[in-house]
């Protein structure tokens, strides 16, 4: 797949040239293939939110370049509005941005500003509402009468209705209960699968990143510390912990097993993968194979009796 995002040596300074100047991004370079689902993680202040606001031109690089679909984002500043239809950005607590009289009008706001005809707008509103699991009976109600989770759905649907080729979400499940969190993120994943939209998801939840993303970008001290597949990034758990981050709970369990000398992989990061790995280990043991990790294996600390 071709790269839909290419970032070259991006740096960004707040208040440049002033005594209170602050570097928010420092020489950041990476690419994203079209159709990828990239999780972005990092400690508070690492540069995550500043990075994603560059993806649709809300911030202009102090230095470096950003290419969206092969085009320099800032080559023609007067055309920056066109890129904002290509890259949809959902901020934290997007329901605070709701303002229209009805949910329908709020979802239709973006498509209307794209200059689409009424039939296409109506089609997009209903499609987006369906993607986020919003009951059509709610479309004519005021968004301010809805629950927090329903408001969040309206806000996300408003971005989806513009059919961006890139969907960027900054903690879209923040503040929701576990059930609401799973519903929102599952709907985003389903949207990604059905439309092929490239997704960038900022999250503090390692479980969410492990479950939904196929690649992970790790920010630390305004730079990219890691950028690889989910498997390879979470296999580097000790390095993530050194950066002040965590790993999925199931990964911690398997790392502990390796510390105890049990021969299991270090890159187990989801429950289904854990179940598959445990069943495979049981089959090996039932076949008479030892599950003792060799002493010279990475993270190994000798054997365990009874394995």
Where are these regions (language model features)?
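Catalytic Walker B motif of ABC-type/P-loop ATPase nucleotide-binding domains
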Residues: 167-170
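Helix-to-loop junction immediately C-terminal to a conserved catalytic motif
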Residues: 56
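Conserved ABC ATPase "signature" C-loop
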Residues: 221-222
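ABC ATPase NBD Q-loop/coupling interface
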Residues: 65-82
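Conserved ABC ATPase "signature" region
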Residues: 119-137
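Conserved catalytic motifs of ABC-family nucleotide-binding domains
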Residues: 163
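Conserved ABC ATPase signature
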Residues: 142-146, 150
């Amino acid at each position: 797949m071709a790269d839909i995002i290419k970032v070259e040596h991006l740096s960004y300074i707040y208040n440049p040239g002033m005594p209170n100047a602050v570097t928010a991004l420092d020489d950041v370079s990476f690419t994203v293939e079209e159709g990828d689902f990239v999780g972005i993680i990092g400690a508070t202040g690492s540069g995550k939110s500043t990075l994603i606001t560059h993806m649709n031109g809300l911030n202009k690089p102090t230095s470096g370049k950003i290419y969206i679909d092969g085009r320099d984002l800032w080559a023609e500043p007067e055309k920056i509005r066109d890129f904002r239809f290509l890259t949809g950005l959902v901020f934290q607590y997007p329901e605070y941005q709701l303002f229209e009289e009805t949910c329908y009008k709020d979802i239709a706001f973006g498509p209307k500003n794209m200059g689409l005809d009424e039939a296409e707008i109506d089609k997009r509103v209903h499609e987006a509402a369906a993607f986020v699991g919003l009951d059509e009976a709610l479309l004519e109600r005021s968004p301010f009468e809805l629950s927090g989770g329903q408001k969040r759905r309206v806000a996300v649907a408003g971005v989806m209705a513009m059919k961006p080729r890139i969907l960027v979400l900054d903690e879209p499940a923040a503040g929701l209960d576990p059930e609401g969190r799973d519903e929102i993120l599952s709907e985003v994943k389903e949207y990604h699968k059905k439309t092929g939209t490239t997704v960038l998801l900022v999250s503090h939840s390692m479980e969410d990143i492990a479950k939904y993303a196929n690649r992970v970008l790790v920010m630390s001290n305004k730079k990219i510390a890691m950028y690889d597949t989910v498997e390879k990034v979470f296999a580097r758990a000790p390095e993530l912990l050194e950066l002040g981050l965590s790993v999925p709970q199931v990964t911690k369990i398997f790392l502990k097993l390796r510390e105890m000398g049990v021969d299991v992989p270090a890159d187990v990061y989801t429950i289904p993968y854990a179940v598959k790995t445990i069943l495979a280990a049981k089959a090996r043991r039932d076949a008479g194979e030892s599950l003792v990790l060799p002493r010279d294996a990475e993270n190994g600390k000798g054997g365990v009796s009874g394995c």
